[in-house]
Amino acid sequence: MYKDLLPIGSVVKLLETERFVMIVGRIVVPEGVDTIYDYVGCIYPEGISSSDDMVFFNRDSIEMLVFVGLQDVQELTYRSEVLDELGELAVVDGEIVPVVDDEEVDTSI
């Protein structure tokens, strides 16, 4: 299992499926759901033809890393400045917010 968040464009094989999934987004909450997923992806090589094609999953669902997406300066900066500083997350009123000491953070600041 990959410990850090994979870059967009990475291709993985999920547990209990023979299909590959390409990562197209990270740290996502599907509309109408109070669950945060590490990733949203699409079936490879077909891609996205409608919103029904989106696959939401977490790191622990990854069986095998097939391809690592682009890791340039922008990706590394994004990961270090944004993703690494997020810590634990929660969904509050439909928005992703950081959790400090198991309490939701006030996002009105």
Residue ranges and their predicted role:
Residues 19-29:
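Short beta-strand-centered aromatic/proline hotspots
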